[in-house]
Amino acid sequence: MNCSIYPPNTLKKYKYVVNISLYQGKLLLSRHKDRKTWETQGGHIEEGETPAQAAARELVEESGAVRFTIRPVCDYAAGEGTLVGGMVFAAIIEELGPMPGMEMAETRLFDSLPDNLTYPEITPVLYSYYHEQFLAQQP
């Protein structure tokens, strides 16, 4: 699977959003109720939503975040053959509430990415860009 990174707002069409979420200085990942693997909070952009609105909605639905800020990190295109576009956001969570319980079974804090990821060909690429490029550019 290919995964390419672009500056924010480069792509003309977005299908997905991904949040790289920090809480108490650690990476917050979620586990879907039907899987044993860990993933970032994100998903499809719904009709009429901007990528930022979708990122905020997915963050709340999949982590229980109550107070947070999000900022665009990059665009990405991933897939085999036909690439599908998405936007990555940095989410700084100040307060977590109860999990909505719709899709995710639990969240957990990590110092780094675990080996058992739901999307092992995409998440490390996005996290690496976030960690090595995006954070380095922040004041």
Indicate residue ranges for each PLM-predicted region.
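Classical N-terminal secretory signal peptides
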Residues: M1, Q138-P139
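Short connector loops at helix/strand junctions that flank enzyme active sites
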Residues: Y14-Y16, L22, K33-R35, T40, ...
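Unchanged
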Residues: I45-T69, D75-Y129
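Conserved hydrophobic "DFG−1" position in protein kinase catalytic cores
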Residues: N19-S21, L29, A91, L109
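Conserved Nudix-box catalytic region and its N-terminal flanking loop in Nudix hydrolases
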Residues: L22-E61
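Glycosyltransferase-associated regions of secretory-pathway enzymes
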Residues: Y129-Q137
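Acidic, metal-coordinating catalytic segment for phosphate/diphosphate chemistry
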Residues: M1-V18
